[in-house]
């Protein structure tokens, strides 16, 4: 496949505090033909540079590589099926961002808020639900929308303490045949925080970070599947201590996943039978519930929504070479 292209953009200074950036990209795909991708960005900043507004809109084009991007296709637990020839995904996206810096005597407060909206056509999504033994890939016969808002608060103090907290509320949905469904393995709410403090006398920096994830809709293997349809709320917390040595080396040590959170033990269905040797199938390849498999399950790791690694210690060195 050949993909020559050209990109042109022009930045226009409307005045001292307003800028407009216009661009267009042209690609010729030897399989899919001519592709045009325009974009526009607007920026306004206050005279003192403590307030900034950014607006952007643009079009995107992407040829999906399923086996590189979706590792679920490589687990071997399900056969992979493609419906027809996959068309490239296209999208239109818009974003509005506002930043406000507030300067105090001994600290700086930064507020950062964004609204984003992306409309996809020809979206390629894995279908886990039509057949529990397959992952079916096809272009969506409808549309997919990802929209949401995010807010970040960042505070930096002169004494070496810095605080960061952010939250994102999203609606990622698929609309097909006028039916709206929530996309699998996507959370509506997520949050992040970071607390950093430098002990100048010791040359040590302490970083405490964490993430909060809301429930995700998960792929089940059928109506008899005993696992929950949605994941629980969960938090991942980490702490790290960094010691700087003579400006050329950093020694760091820390703990990941302080609360030792792991997904439920039954997240991988029938993990004890990865080749389905004890599973009975009918002539159409559907699972038949039996005495040793009353829920009619097969080996399947697609339900796993976060890392199976619990609490763990790490240690390392960073060298700076001038």
Please place each PLM-identified region on the residue numbering.
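Gram-negative outer-membrane beta-barrel transporters
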Residues: 13-19, 111, 116-119, 139-220, ...
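Outer-membrane beta-barrel channels and translocator barrels
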Residues: 15-17, 45-49, 91, 103-106, ...
């Amino acid at each position: 496949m050949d993909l020559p292209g050209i990109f042109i953009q022009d930045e226009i200074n409307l005045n001292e505090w307003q800028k407009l950036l216009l661009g267009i990209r042209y690609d010729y795909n030897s399989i899919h033909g001519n592709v045009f991708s325009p974009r526009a960005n607007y920026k306004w900043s206050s005279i003192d540079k403590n307030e900034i507004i950014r607006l952007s809109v643009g079009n995107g084009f992407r040829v999906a590589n399923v086996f590189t991007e979706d590792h679920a296709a490589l687990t071997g637990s399900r056969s992979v099926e493609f419906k027809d020839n996959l068309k490239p995904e296209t999208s239109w996206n818009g974003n509005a961002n506002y930043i406000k810096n507030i300067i105090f005597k001994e600290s700086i407060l930064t507020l950062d808020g964004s609204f984003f909206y992306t409309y996809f056509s020809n979206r390629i999504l894995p279908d886990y639900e039509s057949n529990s033994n397959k992952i079916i890939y096809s272009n969506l016969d409808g549309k997919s929308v990802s929209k949401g808002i995010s807010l970040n608060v960042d505070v930096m103090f002169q004494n070496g303490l810095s605080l960061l907290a952010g939250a994102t509320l999203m609606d990622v949905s698929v609309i097909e045949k006028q039916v709206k469904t929530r996309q699998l393995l996507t959370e509506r709410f997520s949050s992040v925080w970071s607390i950093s403090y430098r002990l100048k006398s010791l040359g040590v920096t302490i970083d405490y970070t964490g993430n909060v994830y809301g429930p995700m809709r998960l792929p089940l293997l059928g109506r008899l599947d005993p696992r929950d349809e949605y994941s629980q709320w969960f938090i991942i917390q980490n702490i790290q201590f960094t010691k700087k040595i003579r400006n050329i080396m950093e020694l760091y040590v820390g703990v990941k996943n302080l609360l030792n959170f792991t997904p439920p033990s039954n997240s991988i269905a029938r993990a004890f039978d990865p080749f389905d040797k004890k599973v009975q199938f009918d002539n159409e390849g559907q699972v038949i519930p039996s005495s040793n498999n009353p829920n009619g399950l097969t080996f399947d790791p697609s339900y796993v929504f976060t890392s199976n690694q619990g609490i763990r210690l790490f240690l390392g060195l960073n060298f700076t070479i001038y």
